[in-house]
């Protein structure tokens, strides 16, 4: 239950980055926080850019 599993069809990084909140694809703390509560803290730009 820790990290979300990658989807079968993975969008290009820019796409994933753009809809990060909706797709919940990133294997970072975002995925965990996303499930717990709707409101997710935005990560700093450097971290957010990495998919």
From Swiss-Prot:
Coiled coil: none annotated. One of its GO terms (biological process) is chromosome condensation. Keywords: Chromosome, Developmental protein, Differentiation, DNA condensation, DNA-binding, Nucleosome core, Nucleus, Spermatogenesis. Residues 28-51 are annotated as: Disordered. GO terms for cellular component: nucleosome; nucleus. Testis. The keyword tRNA processing does not apply. It comes from the Eukaryota. Residues 33-51 have a biased composition (Basic residues). GO terms for molecular function: DNA binding. Protamines substitute for histones in the chromatin of sperm during the haploid phase of spermatogenesis. They compact sperm DNA into a highly condensed, stable and inactive complex. This is Protamine-Z1. It comes from Scyliorhinus canicula.
